[in-house]
Structure formats: structure tokens, C-alpha cells
């Protein structure tokens, strides 16, 4: 009996060692995975909204290693009975991908796999409109003039993504939280409407391998210019893990939208991986918004 238990214990130890060796060789940083496995999460603008918005888009990722990925995306934002708390969800519906290295070995190189779902709650903890109201009441303009808007966001990542064997998605849950400060400057003219500057810092955590988890801090800077029929934003950011296995991705993103009547906004976007995110992303999409808090 004791001998049998010892043999089973040895088998368990051997299995754990093999598991740890496999995952250490596999790597758990974004650099070795598909573009949507552990993506750099878009910064929040610093202001929640009273609009229900639905966004559909399609992304093409060109890897620095000549890999190709096509991904349709969905995004949804819902005010929770007030504009100060929003529920947001986004989903990489399906990755269609191929690697150029496989071209000589396979007749059909394209594969597809479902992606992960992200859900977050965004809470407005400070807003410049509140400050404007307080200015009128107190007339203490000097001390209140430069107080920014602020949003606290907490979210989760599901483990719904597949094709772990080909390193498309990590097949593990995660969560994140961040805090964004934003200042908005308005102009009184027919063409230029506003300029918003935001910065954020946060925490990102995901499960890796047999037992460990990777903890990373998130960071970002964002600028958004809005005109009558144009919206241009640029964002630099990323996150930094502690395992030094390609887990410190950084990128710069830019997006050009054209707000139209009836709440529609077509847009084009581009993302370039600066470090540990080895892709160019080209995106085209359409956003629809409607005010449901009146």
C-alpha cells in the first residue's frame, strides 16, 4: 500500500515537472502568441457616457514574421441606468490566421478559432461638469479650474479562446483594473470642438502554466481631437509583466473617425507594435450610438 502511494506520488511529481518544463519552453508573454491572446487593452477616454453604443469592425494583423490574421470584432457599451456607470464588453469573434512558413507544407493554410470576451465596469469618480457646477456655486474658480475627469475601470478576461496548441489564445482567465485621468479643452468655433488629454495606470493579471500567474502594471497616454465631422485620437501604452518572457508589450495606436448624422461613425485605425507585440494592425469599423439616458 505504502509502495503504491510512493509510486503515485512520484508520478505526480514527474507530471508537474514535465508540465512546468513544457510551459517554460512554451512561453507566456504576448510576443509568442497570436495578436489577440494578451492584447494591449485600449485606454478609457476618462469620461463615461449616456450613450448605448454598438461597434463592429474587422482587423487585419500583419506579423513581423509574415503571419496573417483576420479578426471580426464586436464592442458594446451600456449605461447602467445613469451615465456615471457603464458596462462595456468586447469580443474578438474569430481569428482567421495562417503562417507563411506553412505555405510549402500545406495546401490550405488558413485556420480559424474563436476568441476571448472582455467585460468591464467603468465608474466615473470625478467629472469636470461637476466642477463647473461647483464653480458657479462657490465662485472659487482659481482652485477648481484644473481638476480633471477620472474613471475607475475593473474588468475580466474569459478563457473562451481556443487553439492553445498553436499559441493563438492562452486558454486561461485574467482580470485588470485601471484609473484614468483626463482633461478636456473646448473651443468656441465652427471647426474645432475640443481636445482631450488622458493618462492611465493600472494592473493586469493572467494565469500562466501549471500554477503561476503573471502580474503586470498597465500604463498609457491618450490624446483625442474632435471637430465637427472628424475625430482623431492617438494612444501610446502597454503593460509590463515580471517574468521577462515577452510579457512587456508596448504599442502606439491611432484612429480617425467621421461622426455622421443619426449617430453613425465610420472609422479607420492602425496599431504598431513597438516592443513584444510583433504586429501591424489595420482596422476598419462602424460605430452606432444613441442616447438612452434623457
Residue ranges, per PLM feature:
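Cleavable N-terminal export/targeting peptides
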Residues: 1-41, 293-294
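Short loop/hinge segments at the start of secondary-structure elements
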Residues: 257
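Hydrophilic extracytoplasmic domains
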Residues: 261-294
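A mid-sequence, solvent-exposed acidic-amphipathic segment
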Residues: 194-237
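Transmembrane beta-barrel domains of Gram-negative outer membranes and organellar outer membranes
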Residues: 30-159, 165, 172-188, 222-243, ...
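Hydrophobic, aromatic-enriched interface-forming segments
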Residues: 168-211
Amino acid at each position: 500500500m505504502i509502495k503504491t502511494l510512493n509510486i503515485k506520488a512520484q508520478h505526480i511529481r514527474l507530471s508537474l515537472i514535465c508540465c512546468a518544463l513544457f510551459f517554460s519552453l512554451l512561453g507566456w508573454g504576448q510576443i509568442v502568441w497570436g495578436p489577440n491572446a494578451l492584447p494591449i487593452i485600449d485606454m478609457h477616454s476618462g469620461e463615461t457616457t449616456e450613450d448605448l453604443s454598438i461597434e463592429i469592425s474587422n482587423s487585419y494583423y500583419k506579423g513581423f514574421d509574415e503571419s496573417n490574421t483576420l479578426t471580426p470584432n464586436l464592442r458594446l457599451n451600456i449605461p447602467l441606468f445613469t451615465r456615471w456607470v457603464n458596462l462595456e464588453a468586447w469580443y474578438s469573434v474569430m481569428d482567421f490566421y495562417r503562417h507563411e512558413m506553412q505555405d510549402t507544407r500545406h495546401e490550405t493554410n488558413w485556420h480559424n478559432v474563436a476568441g476571448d470576451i472582455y467585460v468591464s465596469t467603468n465608474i466615473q469618480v470625478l467629472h469636470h461638469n461637476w466642477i463647473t457646477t461647483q464653480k458657479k456655486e462657490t465662485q472659487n474658480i482659481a482652485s477648481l479650474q484644473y481638476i480633471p475627469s477620472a474613471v475607475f475601470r475593473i474588468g475580466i478576461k474569459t478563457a473562451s479562446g481556443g487553439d492553445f496548441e498553436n499559441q493563438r489564445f492562452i486558454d486561461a482567465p485574467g482580470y485588470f483594473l485601471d484609473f484614468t485621468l483626463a482633461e478636456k479643452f473646448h473651443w468656441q468655433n465652427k471647426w474645432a470642438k475640443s481636445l482631450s488629454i488622458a493618462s492611465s495606470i493600472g494592473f493586469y493579471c493572467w494565469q500562466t502554466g501549471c500554477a503561476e500567474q503573471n502580474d503586470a502594471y498597465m500604463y498609457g497616454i491618450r490624446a483625442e481631437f474632435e471637430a465637427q465631422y472628424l475625430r482623431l485620437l492617438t494612444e501610446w501604452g502597454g503593460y509590463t509583466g515580471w517574468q521577462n518572457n515577452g510579457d512587456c508589450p508596448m504599442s502606439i495606436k491611432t484612429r480617425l473617425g467621421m461622426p455622421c448624422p443619426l449617430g453613425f461613425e465610420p472609422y479607420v485605425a492602425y496599431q504598431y507594435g513597438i516592443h513584444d507585440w510583433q504586429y501591424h494592425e489595420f482596422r476598419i469599423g462602424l460605430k452606432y450610438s444613441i442616447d438612452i439616458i434623457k
